[in-house]
Amino acid sequence: MPAFSFWALILLGWLVPEHFPPWTGFHNEAPAFVGLAVALGLALGAARGRLAPWPAASGLVAVLLLSAWGGVVLLPHTLAGDAWLVTVYLLGFVLAWWLGLQTARDQQGIERPWRAVALVFAAGATVSSLLALFQWTLQEDVLMPWITAADTRRVFGNLAQPNQLATLLLMGLVALGWLRQTRALHAAPALLLAALNTWALVLTQSRTALLSALALFALALLVPRAWAQRRAVVRLAGRWLAAFLVLTGLYRYVLGDIFLLQATEQALTSPSLRPLMWRQLLAGLAESPWWGDGWLRTATAQQVGALKVPGLEQTNYAHNLVLDLLIWCGVPLGLLVIAVAAGWLWRRWRQAQDDAVWCFALLLPLGVHSLLEFPFAYAYFLLTAGFVLGLIDHQTRPVPQAAVAARRARPGLWVAAAAYGALVLALGREYLLVEEDFRITRFENRRIGSTPADYVMPQLHLLNQWGIVLQAMRLRAQPGMSAAELAVLQAAAQRFSWGALHFRYALALGLNGQPEEAARQMRLIQALFGPRMYAEAKADFLSQHDRYPQLARVAIP
C-alpha cells in the first residue's frame, strides 16, 4: 500500500524529540510533508486503470490559496513567505485527501486503509504514553536523547505541548476502541493499552481533553439507531468516560496532595486567558473586517486590538480556527468557507456507516481542540485529517463519482506531486538555514562566543518572514538609522509579537526623529505584554535618556 510510507513517517513525526526555535515544530512536521510527497509518487506509480477524482475540498482550497496570494499583492505588510507556508499546508491537505481517496479505491473500500490508520494511531499514542510516564516520574535521563525533558508537572510526550499529546491520545483511544470492537485486538491487551493511554491522558491535565471526551460520548449518542454497533459503542464510550473522570478526580484531589502537584490544580481550575485574547482579536478584526489582515497575521490583529483591549498573553494564532480564518481572509470569505465545510461534514455524517463513523470519531478531538488552540497548524495533524477525510469521502458519496482515466489524469497529478515535493524540499532547505542563523544570532545578541569573520547571513528566497526577523535581530537601535532599517524593524515587530523586537523598534523610532510613533509603540508594549514587562521596558528606555537626550521627546505612558 503506497500510503504506508506516509503513515510510517507520520508516526516518526509524533516521536521526534527535537524542538528548536524559531519553528519549534519543524522537526516533527517535516516527516509528514516528506511522507506525503513520497506516498504520492508511489501511489501514482502503482495506479492501474483509473485514478480517484480530485477531492471535494479542492475548489475551496483553491479559493483560500488565491486569498493568501492576493493578500501578498493587495494588503500592506503581508509577506510572500507566509503565503508559501500556507501553500505547502493547504496543498498538502488536498493531496493527502486525494491519497486517502486513491488508497480506498485501490483497496476497494476503506476497511483496510482504516485498519492501517487505526494501528498507527494506537501505536503512536501508546509509545507517547510510555514517554509521558517517564516524564511524570522525572526519569527522562533514562531515555535521553530520545525524549523531550518536561519542564512542568504536565506531560507532553515528544509533542512539546500537553494539549497536543492529549489530542493524540484521544485519537489513539478511538483507534483502540475500533480495534477492540472489530475483534482485531483481544480484550486483555485492549484493556491494558486503554488503561495506559487513559492514565497518560489524565497526566496531561488537559481541560481540552475533558471537553473532547464529552464530545466523543455525545457523538456516540448521536449515531443513527440503525447502526448495528451503536449500542455496544455507547456502552463502551460511557464506561471509558466514567473511568476517565474518576481518574482525573483521583489525580487532582488525592495524588495532587500526596505529591504536592500544585500544577494539577492550576491546570484544571485556573482561568484561561483565551477570552481576553479573543476580545483583543475581535477588536483588531473590527478594524479590517472585509479583507482581514492577511494569512498568518493573527499577531498583527492582536496588536491592533491590544490598544483597545489591553492583555497579558501574545499569540501567533487565535486559539480558535473560526476566528483565525476570519482574521486571515476577512469575515465574508471566512464565513463562506466555514459554512461550506460545515455543510459538507453534516451531509457526509448523515451518510456515514460502519468504519466512516469511526473516522468521524477519530477527527472529533482534533476538531474540538481546533476551537481552543491551533493543532490544525501542525502537519502531523492536518495531513492525517486530510487522509481520513478522503476515506470518509470515498465511503459516503451519495452518488459514486466517476474515476478519472489514468492515461489522461496521471501527467497532471505527477506535475502536482512533483511540484509539491520540490516545494517541500525547497522550504525545508531554507528553514534549516534559518534555524542555524537564528542560533548564531541569539549567541551574538547574548555576546556568547564569536561569529567567524567569513560567515555570511543566508539569502532567503521563500521564507522572507524569517529573513526579516534575522535582519531585525542584528540591528542595533541607534541614531542615524536608514528608512530601510526602520522598515525591517517595523515588519518584524508587526509579524511577530516578541518583546525584544517591539522594544528595539520603539527605541529606534525615538532615536530617529519619530517620538509620536515611539510613544505609540511603548503603549503597545504596555497593552500587549502587561505591567511587569512594560515596567522593565520603561526603565530600560528611561535609563538611556542621559546618553540620548532626544528620547526625552517621547511621551511614554
What label would you give each PLM region?
Residues 19-24, 131-144, 251-265, 290:
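Helix-to-loop transition at the C-terminal end of transmembrane segments
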Residues 4-19, 32-44, 69-72, 86-99, ...:
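Alpha-helical transmembrane segments of multi-pass inner-membrane proteins
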Residues 34-36, 217, 355-409:
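Transmembrane alpha-helices of multi-pass inner-membrane enzymes
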Residues 23-28, 81-82, 159-163, 205-209, ...:
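Membrane-interface catalytic loops of GT-C/OST-like multi-pass glycosylation enzymes that act
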Residues 1-74, 78-115, 119, 179-188, ...:
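Transmembrane signal-anchor hairpin modules in multi-pass inner-membrane enzymes, especially those
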Residues 161, 275-315, 322, 329-333:
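TM-adjacent membrane-interface loops and short helices in multi-pass inner/ER membrane proteins
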Residues 20-22, 76-88, 150-165, 270-278, ...:
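Short aromatic-rich membrane-water interface segments that cap or initiate transmembrane helices
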Residues 203-204, 209, 224-269, 282-283, ...:
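A membrane-periplasm/extracellular boundary helix in multi-pass inner-membrane enzymes
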